[in-house]
């Protein structure tokens, strides 16, 4: 194996498989710096129940699902509060749209064929498929997963929709101390690259930087010095939504492939 990351300090934003990813970085000559940005995603049954009741009773013109597990969880939650039939009826009466093949599969299991779905697993792809439809004055229920999907929400609101977001899984941000430390390391040129393995990690870093007033400095670092690496399309899309265009993402959506891509970038740069 080459040494494309020789002497490079590579921050890891994930909290799973950190030993495995650290080993790959070290084999490439790099120095892994573990800075967990994931936080905790938890099942928010109590918080979601009022929204679920509203949707089951008042219905919607459109329903948009962004994850398969989110759809399945909402069905389970509706069953627990005695509204499964009403919930399924509300979905079946509405026009449906979805992001990702797992979500499409979960809808088909319920006998629902969506009117719109992405071609590439991204929110941008989902928005493209929704473009031809009229949302003016329409009520749209959107199932989200731990984060707010700002581009999708802005698109629907611009189209004149009334949006009811439902988050069966909600997010507790990571430890402030960890994110503060990474922001400082970026601004002080102490980190050469940051590896993001989920969109939530991207939001955690940039939301924190916005809150602390570091956002312009952090963006400048990614534009000029440190490189952002994304494990796949959805994570890369979250970076672009934050205004980061100088980034790497492997064709094969694997952590190992992301590190190899990063090493290749530095080898070619040298």
From Swiss-Prot:
InterPro entries registered for this protein in UniProt: 4pyrrol_syn_uPrphyn_synt_sf, 4pyrrol_synth_uPrphyn_synth, UROS/Hem4
GO biological process: uroporphyrinogen III biosynthetic process
Highest taxon listed in the record's lineage: Bacteria
Residues annotated as transmembrane: none
Any GO molecular function: uroporphyrinogen-III synthase activity
Coiled coil stretches, renumbered: none
Protein's recorded name: Uncharacterized protein YjjA
Originating organism: Bacillus subtilis (strain 168)
